[in-house]
């Protein structure tokens, strides 16, 4: 792998690619375990990776692993660590004196009216931002004062707010990394963690372009349909109309057949 790739995020944060094991070829090799790497072309590799993604064959994607160094506000890290399939190691406030680095948004957001856990629209309130900075200064001042009085680092840190920056290493396989990106790139994800997801997506797209294309097509921009939703579609479409629409978008052969069967079932598809 080439030198470290670092992308700035928020006002003081970043995402840095530390290491990578495997790439698109590792996915293909795992899927063709009986034959080894072989002499397949990039086009054939892309078709195989696309097949694996749309049929939810996940284990070949687990053969690719990324390790990132991340600097993010504590409240972002706590959301991040809800994804429990990764290996994580975070800077310790028991062993280190934490730096006076706080995330300060350009503007606050209003509480969403329809979603209790979301926000919407900018709240341009200089008094609110001034209050945030006041709390930061007082909290960090109290932290340093406690340390000077001999209070243990593991206890002095209790006064620090959630917008303090933390750093951690995060190692994740590609299958679960795609799941992270599917959730954290979504519009309903908190804005701050979406910025980190976008930075990671930029790196992943560059490093495994064939896998990213399949992820984007089938998971990121795709959707699952319930039984009720399928019934509604079948009531609005005929196989002939749907086939014509799919063909106009470039689908043909087995891909066209699969798409028809997905909506109308194997007994009804053309």
From Swiss-Prot:
Co-factor binding details: Binds 4 FAD per tetramer. Each FAD binding site is formed by three monomers.
PANTHER family: FLAVIN-DEPENDENT THYMIDYLATE SYNTHASE (PTHR34934:SF1)
EC number: 2.1.1.148
Protein name: Flavin-dependent thymidylate synthase
Subunit structure as annotated in this protein's UniProt entry: Homotetramer.
Record field: transmembrane: none
Entry keyword set: FAD, Flavoprotein, Methyltransferase, NADP, Nucleotide biosynthesis, Transferase
Enzyme active site: 184
Assigned protein family: Belongs to the thymidylate synthase ThyX family.
Catalytic activity: dUMP + (6R)-5,10-methylene-5,6,7,8-tetrahydrofolate + NADPH + H(+) = dTMP + (6S)-5,6,7,8-tetrahydrofolate + NADP(+)
EC class of the enzyme, as a word: transferase
Pathway: Pyrimidine metabolism; dTTP biosynthesis
UniProt binding sites for dUMP: 79-82, 90-94, 157, 184
Motif stretch (ThyX motif): 82-92
The species this protein was found in: Thermus thermophilus (strain ATCC BAA-163 / DSM 7039 / HB27)
Pfam families (alphabetical): Thy1
Record-listed FAD binding positions: 59, 82-84, 90, 173-175, 179
Domain spans labelled ThyX: 13-218
